[in-house]
Amino acid sequence: MKEQEYFNVADIFGENVFNDSVMRERLPKKTYQKMKEVISQGRELDPETADVVAHEMKEWAIEKGATHYTHWFQPLTGVTAEKHDSFITAPMSNGKVLMSFSGKELIKGEPDASSFPSGGLRATFEARGYTAWDCTSPAFVRQDAAGATLCIPTAFCSYTGEALDQKTPLLRSMEAVSKQSVRLLRLFGNTTSQRVMPSVGAEQEYFIVDRAKYLQRKDLVYTGRTLFGAMPPKGQEMDDHYFGAIRERIAAYMRDVNIELWKLGVSSKTQHNEVAPAQHELAPIYAEANVAVDHNQLIMETLKKVAGRNGLQCLLHEKPFAGVNGSGKHNNWSLVTDDGINLLEPGKTPHDNIQFLLVLACILRAVDEHADLLRESAADVGNDHRLGANEAPPAIISVYLGEQLQDVLTQLIDTGAATHSISGAKLETGVKTLPDFMKDATDRNRTSQFAFTGNKFEFRMVGSQDSVGEPNIVLNTIVAEAFADVCDILEKAEDFDLAVHDLIKQLVTDHQRIVFNGNGYSDAWVEEAERRGLPNIKSMVEAIPALTTDKSIALFERFGVFTKAELESRAEVEYELYAKEINIEAKTMIDIAGKQIIPAVIKYATELGTSINTIKAACDANVSVQTELLVEVSDLLADTKVALAKLQEVVAEGLTMEENESRAKFYHDEVFKAMEELRAPVDTLEMLVDKEAWPMPSYGDLIFEV
């Protein structure tokens, strides 16, 4: 074991980030002040300032060892993209080169827009696209085996201005919710807050397996999840992995991840074992939404990159292993002013906090009226495997408020006024040496998709490998709409106090159906939700149409977040993505079954038959056990061959379909079903065939031997 290196986190935190302290130190005072205004007040960046910033950024990056820069952006592929350009200029007459980086190169790039998903917005011959510097998310230097690269967070749009990424609409939605939040604050006499920013913290779950074993599983390599696999004798039923002692190999990996992230200014805070064997979680401290989205991408990239260095493999798929919990990403969301006021802070007496109650009522309205959009924002091929099982919230959107706030709302609905708030009692353990302390006013509900957790909402439906961009785009926009509508009413009110009380009561009464504080895993809740008229959208394919309803188009166009064309293009991209992912999984199953499993089982059955004949020839022994096993294996082998032929047939049919939506529905209804039918006999065979004869590592090998 290598000797442990000790250090002070404060000494390395943000050392590879061109942050405010670096700008204050390196930029001329006038330039620094202009940049502060651009970042904090949303002012335009003039070319002269951009040139000065670019020069200092380049000099700083070169000191860090950087030879190249890249516009780091997030297209609709779900992962980041980048093109690297070196700082060198054309050689001079003496053969030497200079290192140069201009303001124009800083603020604008030109990747090929036709090579990324666009849903028809860009044809192959319409290649021009632009990346634009998001100066509110700091540039950073990424150091790895390939060297050091200056990474500039950017937005990505087409030549005609349509958004082709996650960041552009996210920034638009942030402006929308800020503007409407400030309107609401002004109604309550706040004249100091100038901006309100969504604050986001994304908890990241993941699996870690041994890389050598991972490389022996084509399904993991090609799709990120196991397409075959029988459960080992032990799974997660003992509840001994969650918060258990972290194994030394994993702890060393986590340490390396933290060091990388801290240097990049990502405030990695919490790490622990999750419920399933080999499953873990990393959680950062909150940041402004666009920075938090960038940081989550950095977290996922770093988890994968550092795993490889440690002989490990990080699995970010929502359901890499059947039979144990999958992975999600809890999106913690609140609204905070530029002078530090959290709009979701209820205070000690929330019944008296009228501003908070109005904000809460607006959020209930937003979630109730746009539950389909919120569900769509978490729609993902992998997420279809975990939503609705006893490991993740069901696909029905509801809001958990807890005992304290539910009691306040009940008072408002029943009497028109709330006069008291339930307080947290003292927790007494009965052990004198343990301190007594005040409990929170409400418990936590881990089965809720959208839960109030003290001073924020936690959206727990997001998939582990997805960007948190889309969920926050939707949250920001639907809340902006609710704020705008109540401001339209209250700004015209003759008696504000009376009007705001009446409006809060009306909103919580009209939208109380969205509140559910019980067990979201129960069948009874599914039935109750249906009685309440709440949508139960069970799959990604069923969720996508929410993007292009008249209501959704009107919502996003009203606040300038998406155009109709942009929404239609995203729906097309998602249909296409769904069909492609299932197609890759199906072809991988065909490949594994045909080239590995069937040959291995035939060989095993042949050896079994030879063994039976050898024993019979040697003596009159009882070979009924071997014979029964051979018959069972042979029957399952025949079932496997039939199921394989069926899967090949439906995949071929799916490939003939040209229209994205119909193809996606076919893959959901027919291809996925055929995949399940192939898996069933294969998983049974794995439990019968000699382990030495089975052609790939088992679940037990993967999740317990790391």
Residue ranges and their predicted role:
Residues 1-32, 46, 128-133, 138-152, ...:
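Catalytic pocket of metal/acid-base enzymes, prominently hydrolases
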Residues 12-127:
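Active-site core of metal-dependent hydrolases
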Residues 49, 73, 102, 284, ...:
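Active-site proximal loops enriched in glycine and acidic residues that flank catalytic Cys/His/Asp
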Residues 71-74, 329-333:
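Histidine-centered catalytic micro-motifs
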Residues 78-94, 111-114, 119, 217, ...:
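Short linear, low-complexity motifs centered on an aromatic residue
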Residues 127-316, 325-328, 335-572:
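Glycine-rich, acidic/polar active-site loops that bind/position phosphate-bearing ligands
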Residues 220-221, 296, 318-319, 345-349, ...:
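Composition- and surface-driven signal marking solvent-exposed, interaction-prone regions
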Residues 504-706:
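C-terminal amphipathic alpha-helical interaction region
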